[in-house]
Design a protein with these regions (language model features):
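ATP-dependent phospho-/nucleotidyl transfer catalytic cores
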Residues: 16-132, 143, 261
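Activation segment
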Residues: 147, 155-157, 254
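ATP/Mg2+ or Mg2+-diphosphate-binding catalytic cores
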Residues: 222-312
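Conserved catalytic-loop position in the HRD/HxD motif
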Residues: 134, 139, 151
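Conserved short submotifs of the Hanks-type protein kinase catalytic core
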Residues: 2-14
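Long, amphipathic alpha-helical stalk/connector segments used for oligomerization, subunit docking
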Residues: 218-220
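Pre-DFG segment of protein kinase catalytic domains
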Residues: 130, 148-151
Length: 312
């Protein structure tokens, strides 16, 4: 088994914060390659499919992280979907002008609540792999040579899709910001391509790692292999959706959103992101891929709508 932490967890002095780089319009050409390499190579080797099962159980105990998991379970997978009195702590921060939109599309959508409940349950009960647990673009440093990852304090054994989804979701913030603040078409195209390639290359590399590392005969059955990998990517798109939504309406927002101070830009941008998040959550099991999710966001942008008429 490969050592943990994986190789990108090293000195970052020659690297720059990915969130800030994307905000400045610098999209590295090999970013999707680097992100997908890290995800595939750090996640699958820590599963029961590859690890010795006794060692895996020891690792699960060692990396039990209840206090920080509580934060995710509350702030990411509960509170963005509930209003008072069901949400007594009420940490959501909804931009004035979007209150009715949030109430209708997040607080009152029972079908969405059922899907988020499934994702929350998976986060709490699927000790699938050792995950970073907070893998947003502020925890990634990059340059033309590669990436480095920091801040693993949320690490625990959870669903692989949570890390993958956090990466995908945070890339969309950069695209949304550029789309609503007059960013160049070239930058927007580069961001779209990076998202599409990150989605698809991650799926491809997970499959390649699976074929290389998994040797247990039952796990090598083609139907199981397909179901397992499809499940990981379905989780990934779902958690991308919950990450997007929580960064818009929750109390831990991202600079790509908060830096937009003109309500004429901020309000529709937030609605578009919420709209995308709902789409990803509700359609996660429908065989999504990079082309499908970027095409969906292009539709949202092209129509200039504050509400996506058919969320699901």
């Amino acid at each position: 088994m490969r050592p943990w932490p994986p190789s990108p967890w090293k000195d970052i002095s020659a690297y720059k914060n990915l969130r800030k780089e994307l905000a400045a319009g610098r999209v590295y050409g090999h970013l999707s390659e680097n992100l997908s390499d890290f995800l595939a190579q750090s996640l699958l080797p820590t599963t029961d499919l590859v690890m010795d099962r006794q060692e895996k159980k020891k690792q699960v105990r060692f990396f039990t992280n209840p206090e920080l998991c509580d934060i995710t379970e509350d702030l990411v997978l509960t509170e963005p979907y509930l209003a008072q009195p069901m949400n007594p702590r009420n940490k959501n921060i909804v931009t004035p002008g979007n209150e009715d939109f949030v109430r209708e599309h997040l607080y009152e959508d029972e079908a969405l609540h059922a899907e988020v409940a499934a994702l929350r349950n998976g986060f709490m009960n699927n000790a699938q792999a050792l995950i970073h647990g907070d893998l947003h673009s502020g925890s990634i440093f990059a340059n033309e040579q590669g990436i480095k990852v920091i801040d693993p304090e949320f690490a625990f054994y959870g669903p692989m899709g949570y890390d993958i989804g956090n990466v995908i979701g945070n890339l969309f913030f950069a695209w949304a910001n550029k789309a609503y603040t007059g960013g160049s078409a070239e930058t927007q195209t580069a961001l779209e391509q990076t998202i599409r390639e990150t989605c698809d290359k991650t799926a491809e590399k997970l499959a390649a790692e699976y074929d290389k590392l998994v040797t247990f005969p039952l796990y090598c059955a083609s139907a199981f292999r397909k179901a397992y990998l499809d499940g990981v990517m379905a989780d990934s798109y779902g958690y991308a959706g919950t990450e997007i939504i929580r960064r818009v309406v929750g109390d831990s927002k991202v600079i790509e959103v908060t830096s937009v101070t003109d309500p004429a830009q901020r309000l529709p941008m937030e609605r578009a992101l919420i709209d995308l998040g709902i789409y990803l959550i509700k359609n996660r099991a429908g065989g999504l891929n990079g082309a499908a999710v970027t095409e969906e966001f292009r539709k949202i942008l092209a129509e200039g709508r504050g509400t996506h008429g058919q969320n699901g």
